[in-house]
């Protein structure tokens, strides 16, 4: 089978590997779609922590069942999506129902080889039947689930003022589910094309260009009260620190992105506003189900997918996805 390796930062290669045998208790999946996310781009550019090379990237996956264990609810040919967070099931986080925070987590495409392959054998508890979804929709489920989980953490309610800082794919995923919860969503970002997409396709009520006077605009939108819930999806420590100033009294600040460095905030302001600070990590099976329900109902625009390539084209075309001028939102790799 064909597999794409990131050998070193900036260097991809195609290799022929034996088709894997189905492991005990596992499902052999014929991979059909691989969504490209920021993690893959960071691996390619050499900016992903906790990673060793060479590595097969890819964790936003869909495919069809090639072979399932006896007694499985899955059958040959079923369209499936894959939860890429391989959790242990017995640590304190898993036992509390927070498999997304497993102490022994192994993420496909990061800690172990991922899905830029033709076939992958995956423990059956991480393979979800994507009934009623297209292969594209099923491959979008993972990144959308990160947004759905963040919105659940922030407990967005009807008519709340919601600010999302960062209009990349994860920020857009947050926007989708904040709008579905009834939030009045404002997006702030430096890229006009992405802000326009958020307003045109995702239901954002307001968009603000990052730069001089942006805080005044945010104040005007909320009549000076600022926001009930603020989400950071930038992965930038300075932006994360600045985000505290956008939270209204009694509001919540949800950090969806993660950085390796420390961040700081003004403690008197934090206490004066009685701010709630939350982290949001990965997603749980419940979030995946929530996303698939929304996809089946036609509530998520497939226009999020802007670029496509075949698996065999990845070594030659992948670098183009890193160019801001290309207007990439979500790249999708197709496996014949």
Please report, for each region that a protein language model flagged, where it lies by residue.
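Glycine-rich beta-strand-centered segment in the early N-terminal region that forms part
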Residues: 18-34, 47-92, 131-133
């Amino acid at each position: 089978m064909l597999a794409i390796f990131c050998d070193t930062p900036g260097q991809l290669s195609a290799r022929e590997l034996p088709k894997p045998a189905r492991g005990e208790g596992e499902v052999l999946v014929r991979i059909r779609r691989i969504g490209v996310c920021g993690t893959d781009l960071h691996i390619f550019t050499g900016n992903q922590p906790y990673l060793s090379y060479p590595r097969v990237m890819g964790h936003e996956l869909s495919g069809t069942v090639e072979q399932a264990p006896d007694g499985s609810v899955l059958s040959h040919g079923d369209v499936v999506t894959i939860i890429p967070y391989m959790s242990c099931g017995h640590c304190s986080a898993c036992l509390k129902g927070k498999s997304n925070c497993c102490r022994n987590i192994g993420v496909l495409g990061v800690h172990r080889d991922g899905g830029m392959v033709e076939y992958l054998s995956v423990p059956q508890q991480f393979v979800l039947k994507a009934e009623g979804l297209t292969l594209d929709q099923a491959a979008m489920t993972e990144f959308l689930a990160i947004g759905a989980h963040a919105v659940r953490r922030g407990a967005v309610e009807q008519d709340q003022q919601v600010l999302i800082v960062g209009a990349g794919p994860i920020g857009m995923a947050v926007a989708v589910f904040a709008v579905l919860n009834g939030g009045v969503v404002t997006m702030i970002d430096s890229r006009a094309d992405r802000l326009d997409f958020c307003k045109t396709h995702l239901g954002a009520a307001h968009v603000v260009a990052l730069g001089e006077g942006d805080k005044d605009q945010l104040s005007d939108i909320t009549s000076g009260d600022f926001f009930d819930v603020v989400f950071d999806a930038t992965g930038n420590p300075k932006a994360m620190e600045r985000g505290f100033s956008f939270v209204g009294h009694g509001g919540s600040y949800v950090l969806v992105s993660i950085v390796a460095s420390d961040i700081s905030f003004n403690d008197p302001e934090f206490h004066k506003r009685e701010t709630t600070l939350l982290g949001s990590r990965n997603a749980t099976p419940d979030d995946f189900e929530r996303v698939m329900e929304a996809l089946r109902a036609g509530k998520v625009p497939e226009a999020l997918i802007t670029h496509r390539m075949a698996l065999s084209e990845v070594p030659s075309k992948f670098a183009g996805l890193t160019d801001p001028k290309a207007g990439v939102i979500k790249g999708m790799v197709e496996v014949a």
